[in-house]
Each structure stands twice: as C-alpha cells, then as structure tokens.
C-alpha cells in the first residue's frame, strides 16, 4: 500500500471582504476600483502608478499630475 501523504504547507490567509466595502448609513460603497473586463465582483490592486487586476491581468495606469503640469 502507498504511504499516506503528509500535510503540505500552510495556506495563505484569505482576504477580508469587509475591507473592500464602506457602510455609511443605509448605503454601501466600494473602496477599491472594479475591473472593467471582469466585472463588478473583481477588485483591482492599487500600486504606486497603476491599477492591476489579479484575475485577467488588465492594467490601467494612473494619470501623473506632475508630468501633466510640466507639459
């Protein structure tokens, strides 16, 4: 008989979905930007100069105010 496999590495902690929404009175608003390709249920990661979707890889660059003022 085959030996039983041991336990693999620990799982990464899951994200708290409640951090992505803000409740004010009776209204709920999203705090992060949604991916335009994947839809409203997929949030984009906010980096220094861009937004990135972890599901489809869509990138959207932020507009840099410093470069626009210089031109």
Curated annotation (Swiss-Prot):
InterPro entries (alphabetical): Ribosomal_eS31, Ribosomal_eS31_arc, Ribosomal_zn-bd
One Gene Ontology term of the molecular function aspect: zinc ion binding
Domain of life of the organism encoding this protein: Archaea
Cofactor binding remark: Binds 1 zinc ion per subunit.
Keyword Flavoprotein: no
Binding locations of Zn(2+): 35, 38, 53, 56
Any GO CC annotation of this UniProt entry: ribosome
Pfam families reported in the protein's UniProt record: Ribosomal_S27 (PF01599)
One record GO biological process: translation
Zn finger (C4-type) start-end: 35-56
Keywords: Metal-binding, Ribonucleoprotein, Ribosomal protein, Zinc, Zinc-finger
Protein family membership: Belongs to the eukaryotic ribosomal protein eS31 family.
NCBIfam families tied to this protein: PRK00432.1 (NF001669)
Subunit record text: Part of the 30S ribosomal subunit.
Stated name of the protein: Small ribosomal subunit protein eS31
Gene of this entry: rps27ae
């Amino acid at each position: 008989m085959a030996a039983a496999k041991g336990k693999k590495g620990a799982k990464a902690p899951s994200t708290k979905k409640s951090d992505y929404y803000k409740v004010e009175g009776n209204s709920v608003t999203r705090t992060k930007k949604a991916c335009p390709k994947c839809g409203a249920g997929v949030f984009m990661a906010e980096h220094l100069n861009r937004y990135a979707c972890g599901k489809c890889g869509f990138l959207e660059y932020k507009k840099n105010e410093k470069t626009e003022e210089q031109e």
